[in-house]
């Protein structure tokens, strides 16, 4: 049975991704910072819970040790945990270095913390896959094209963190050719991150995450994908 870990899986896209992977026969670890909500989600899903705060090195290491002791390997890692950031939309000059650090600590450094801690387990896995949840707002091509809706969204910390995440994904893919690393854009999905203002459901948004988490050993690596295919970034 394939073993998967999803960060930020107690709600939204992470929860739906966990549900779909369990439905497909995976053994899933629900990673969540809040122990009560994480356990509740895991119970609802029929998953296993592991407390995991991606901004805390000790928490990440402890989670990796739990999975190592329990499963001995990891086949699928979905780095889904993320924050919207300072929410100073359109007010670039108001964004501080502290705002940037807070957003990057979850959206970029958190992914690196988790990936670093779980790399030995991924290397022991069966055709291992890592899916990093980015955003269309992380596409330089989209955000600089006046004809695209992304062009109108100016969020210095969030957008740039999602751009950085795609590059992080690319670098890991080159360094670890036996592991398929890909970034995905789930689309503008109604979640807590955007106050449920998104134009599509979590079921629709999770589609590309689940698809890329399910690729075989001959699947793509180092790419950025949405439900329509490769994304220019």
Q: What is the predicted role of each segment?
A:
Residues 24-40:
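Conserved glycine-rich Rossmann-like NAD(P)H-binding loop of the short-chain dehydrogenase/reductase
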Residues 78, 114-118, 122, 168-169, ...:
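Hydrophobic positions on the long internal alpha-helix
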Residues 66-79, 85, 96:
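A glycine-rich helix->loop->beta "capping" turn
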Residues 163-166, 170, 174, 178-179, ...:
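C-terminal helical subdomain
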Residues 83-84, 91-104, 123-174:
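Catalytic loop of short-chain dehydrogenase/reductase
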